[in-house]
């Protein structure tokens, strides 16, 4: 399933619904405040990911949230669904193209 996170629940819900309609699974991930502290950096204003942590997708969402405070936004993280992933072949699954098409088509 593609990870979905954002600062507007209505928008996130529409994306999750588009996933259900299109048959491309999506799952909402939390952007809890405690994850924000992982972006602390001794070398820059903000780190884009914390070393050695297992919540990289969520940390990526937290990173995006720092630059989108004035906007409603949602992020569809495709890292887990985009590659064929069989270890033998190169290429992409095409996911979440169907989800995104369904979202755009149903929200015109």
Model-derived segments and spans:
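A generic structural signal for tightly packed, nonpolar segments enriched in small/aliphatic residues
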Residues: 1-108
């Amino acid at each position: 399933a593609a990870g979905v996170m954002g600062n507007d629940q209505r928008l996130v819900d529409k994306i999750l619904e588009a996933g259900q309609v299109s048959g491309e699974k999506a799952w909402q991930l939390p952007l809890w405040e405690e994850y924000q502290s992982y972006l602390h950096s001794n070398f820059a204003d903000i780190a884009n990911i914390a070393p050695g942590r297992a919540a990289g997708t969520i940390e990526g969402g937290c990173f995006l949230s720092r630059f989108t405070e004035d906007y409603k936004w949602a992020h569809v993280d495709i890292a887990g669904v985009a590659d064929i992933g069989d270890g033998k072949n190169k290429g992409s699954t095409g996911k979440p193209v169907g989800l995104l098409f369904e979202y755009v088509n149903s929200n015109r």
